[in-house]
Amino acid sequence: MHVLIVDDEPLAREELSYLVSQHPQVTSVAEADSVAEAMEEMMDQKPDLLFLDIHLTDESGFDLAEKLTHLKKAPYLVFATAYDQYALKAFQVNAKDYILKPFEEEKITQVIEKASKEMGQAVPENTAEKGPKSEAIPIQGEDRIYLVAPEDIYLVSVEERQLSIFVDQQVYKMTGTLNSIEQKLPATLFIKTHRSFILNRTKIQEIQPWFNNTLQVILTNGSKVPVSRSYVKEFKEKLGLS
């Protein structure tokens, strides 16, 4: 994996270069302090993974990110910056991750492993399935924002404005309302079963009768989700059970 680090601070570049180079997947690390120098490096090295700061010596990191959108094969883009307020904007220009300074070894490892996995699973364009993909959902973590594919979500629940998004064996937490995230989820994939629950219909394993004419849904990950009386009719209709 060829890595390019674009940052106008020499010490930050040096630190990140050291952390990145500790991983066996990384075969080379190049550095640049400006958009112009970064473009030269990209023409020469064609990096697989790009760590990009926001404030550079000539233009903004977003200017470079915008240029990447026009490339036939853009590098795996990770913003690495001291500013947390630009995270949502970063994902709008196709960033895969957003990490904050000072850098932590564990987070760099997560980025490298995630990038390696995605590159290893890449399918040539002429053999890839052409089915439509849902837009990833940004989820605000403690110190970073995660992008989660809707089809990977099993369940979303809310309690006192605290959202829990269940993805495989992991649970992401964020502040918000169920309605706010429901609007971002594809209606063909998700069903609201209760004022506090939305589930992915493709993750349903079993539906059981419950008390007072309600239902209980068992998901493939073992989660149990109630279907309240006011949602039973709509739930059955969406599954073709009525």
UniProtKB/Swiss-Prot annotation:
What PTM annotation applies here?
A: Phosphorylated by LytS.
Keyword Cytoplasm on this protein?
A: yes
| SMART domains in the cross-refs | LytTR (SM00850), REC (SM00448)
Q: Name one Pfam family in it.
A: Response_reg
User: Per its UniProt record, what SUPFAM superfamilies does this chain match?
Assistant: CheY-like
Q: Which domain of life is it from?
A: Bacteria
Tell me where in this chain the HTH LytTR-type domain is found.
137-241
Q: What does this protein do?
A: Member of the two-component regulatory system LytS/LytT that probably regulates genes involved in cell wall metabolism.
Q: Where is the Response regulatory domain?
A: 2-116
Task: Give the protein name, as stated in the record.
Answer: Sensory transduction protein LytT
Record carries keyword Transcription: yes
The disulfide bridges present are none
GO cellular component, alphabetical, reads: cytoplasm
* InterPro entries xrefs: CheY-like_superfamily, LytR-like, LytTR_DNA-bd_dom, Sig_transdc_resp-reg_receiver
Name the CDD domains on file: REC_LytTR_AlgR-like
Any idea where this protein resides?
Cytoplasm
Q: Which UniProt keywords apply?
A: Cytoplasm, DNA-binding, Phosphoprotein, Transcription, Transcription regulation, Two-component regulatory system
Q: What is its main location?
A: cytoplasm
